[in-house]
Structure formats: C-alpha cells, structure tokens
Amino acid sequence: GDTIALTMPTYPAYKNMLKALDINIVEIETTKETNYQPTAELLENSGKKFDGIIITNPSNPTGAMINEETLQDICNWCDNNNVRLISDEAYHGITYETPAQTALVHSKSALVLNTFSKYFALTGWRLGWLITPENMASRIKSLAENLFVSPPTIAQHVALQSFNHMDVLDGYVEQYRTNRDILRARLPELGFGDMSSAQGAFYFY
C-alpha cells in the first residue's frame, strides 16, 4: 500500500484514519527549532520514503504556523519528488500575527482540506470542503458518494449564512487572541516556560 508521512506532533486521529485505510505511516519529528513544523530540508534529510505527506497549518496541537517561504519550499520539494501534499487548513482564519498561507498558492497538485467547524464556529454541523486537482475530482466524488452521499441541506444553508456575519467571527478570533495572550503571560509563571509560539488555532504545546 501507499505510505503517508506525518510530521510529529500532529493531529492524533490521523494515525487511526490511515490505519483504517490500510495505509502505511512514517513519522518525521519536528522540534522547537523548526517551529514544530516541517521544512523541505527536514523532509529531504529524513531518509524516509513516502507517497504523500499531511501538514497542518496552523498546527493542531502546537498552534505553530508555516511561513510563506517555507511552505513554498515544501510544495516545491513535494512536486520535485512526486509526493502528494495534503494540506489541512482547518484553522485558517484563526491567526494572530500573519494570515496563514494556503498551499494552493504554491502547488497545483496539493489536496487542501478545510472545515466550517473552526473559524466559522459551526462545530457539530460536520461540514467542510476539499479542494483537489481537476484530474482527481471525479474519483473523489465517487468515493464521497459511497461514504456520506451529501451533507445535510440545513447545514449548507447555515454555512452560507455565516458569510454574512464575518464581523462576529472575527470578534471570536480577537477573544481567542486575548485568551492566548493571558495564557502566554501566565503559564511561564506556573512552570510551563518552554512552549510553542501559538501563532494560530487555540493551542499551546
């Protein structure tokens, strides 16, 4: 079977999902020095072979982000090495310093995942989207029809209405920022000094 690389730490459920699909997994460790995110150099020097890689930007569980130059390098590395990039962008919109860059800017072969559960605050409605290269669209559509048919109509209507209330959603992000700043100031006083930068999402690591 195919082999997918996960850059650690990562969203824990990925392992279970991939194992359920009988996909082999290799792990590539990131560190604070790489901002708990992969780099093209890290992938090149990993010594591991894989057909695809999943990245999360901003990251769950670290809140760390991949800057634009590094993301471009990763996209180029994947294209040059025939590795499918799968970019989980669920936390786009929840950033505190610079906006998160989408892999679509740098790659025509990447798969991009997103959801209405995070920035749009529709957790529980289980609605999201996938952006795929055109040559994969029909196969993914066939797969989707056999897994969940289609999302509920009411969830789609609610999601569309959320675009009319971006000011409210941005207000949520400002509240997340306030909470992050409080924690970033207080946690070191409690002994949690060596933390991730928490540039996005709502996690410290």
Go through each PLM region and give its residues.
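Conserved glycine-rich beta-strand-loop-beta hairpin in the small C-terminal domain of fold type I
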Residues: 160, 176-187, 194-205
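Active-site phosphate-binding strand-loop segment of PLP-dependent enzymes
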Residues: 30-98
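Conserved PLP-anchoring active-site segment centered on the Schiff-base-forming lysine
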Residues: 1-18
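A short helix->loop->beta-strand "cap" motif at the edges of active sites that frequently abuts
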Residues: 2, 23, 80-84, 108
